């Protein structure tokens, strides 16, 4: 009986540790970042328009599409920043005071895609993530929310947005990453932060 319990404990611990091993397999950011950097003039323009760091935009391009403006995912996320017309695209249109949602050809246009991606990051920062004080924590929260939705992130802290933001403000960047690794329902969430750091280091 003791041996059986010990074996179960080993399996349980292995499962727990693997959940947080978001750095495997290693991601080499060099080539994706090089390809994303060709769009830096557009990223700088969009970043200035929406108050978003162009390096953050470039990192997201490297992670999401590897710099390919024609990239389309299985979930129909399109273009350099992998925007979905019916979700993030619609949110940006609403912010601009427009009806409907962007077309596929619009999302494959590098300038339009990057502009809308920057606008969506601004929507996240000034909306559901408003009030996060630490710049690095905010950066991490932005990319996790960009990839998996702000609601999913905030609910790992509290069902009340203000309480969630308050709890986030009690954490430094490393503590925030550990919280995401332990509590976020999407296993790719902490890996996105890992890829972000790899991309920023490669610039």
UniProtKB/Swiss-Prot annotation:
Keywords: Cell outer membrane, Cell wall biogenesis/degradation, Lipoprotein, Lyase, Membrane, Palmitate, Signal. It is a lipid-anchor. A lipid is attached at residue 16 (S-diacylglycerol cysteine). The N-terminus is blocked. A lipid is attached at residue 16 (N-palmitoyl cysteine). GO terms for biological process: cell division; cell wall macromolecule catabolic process; cell wall organization; peptidoglycan metabolic process. Pfam families: SLT. It is found in: Cell outer membrane. Residues 1-15 form the signal peptide. GO terms for molecular function: lytic endotransglycosylase activity; peptidoglycan lytic transglycosylase activity. SUPFAM superfamilies: Lysozyme-like. GO terms for cellular component: cell outer membrane. It catalyses: Endolytic cleavage of the (1->4)-beta-glycosidic linkage between N-acetylmuramic acid (MurNAc) and N-acetylglucosamine (GlcNAc) residues in peptidoglycan with concomitant formation of a 1,6-anhydrobond in the MurNAc residue. Its EC number is 4.2.2.n2. Its main location: membrane. Murein-degrading enzyme. May play a role in recycling of muropeptides during cell elongation and/or cell division. Preferentially cleaves at a distance of more than two disaccharide units from the ends of the glycan chain. Prefers cross-linked murein in vivo. Belongs to the transglycosylase Slt family. This is Endo-type membrane-bound lytic murein transglycosylase A. It comes from Escherichia coli (strain K12).
């Amino acid at each position: 009986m003791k041996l059986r319990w010990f074996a179960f404990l080993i399996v349980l611990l292995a499962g727990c540790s693997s959940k947080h091993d978001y750095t495997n397999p290693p991601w080499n950011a060099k080539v994706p970042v090089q390809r994303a950097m060709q769009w830096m003039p557009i990223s700088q323009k969009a970043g200035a328009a929406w108050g978003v760091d162009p390096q953050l935009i470039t990192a997201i391009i490297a992670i999401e599409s590897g710099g390919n403006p024609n990239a389309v995912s299985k979930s129909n996320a399109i273009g350099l920043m992998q925007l979905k017309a019916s979700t993030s695209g619609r949110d940006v249109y609403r912010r601009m005071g427009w009806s409907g949602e962007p077309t596929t050809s619009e999302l494959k246009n590098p300038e339009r895609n990057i502009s809308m991606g920057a606008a969506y990051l601004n929507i996240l920062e000034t909306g559901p993530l408003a009030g996060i004080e630490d710049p690095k924590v905010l950066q991490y929260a932005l990319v996790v929310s960009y990839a998996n939705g702000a609601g999913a992130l905030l609910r790992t802290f509290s069902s009340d947005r203000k309480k969630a933001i308050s709890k986030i403000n009690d954490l430094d960047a490393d503590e925030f990453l550990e919280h995401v690794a332990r509590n976020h329902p999407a296993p790719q969430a902490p890996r996105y932060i890992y890829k972000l750091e790899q991309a920023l280091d490669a610039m």
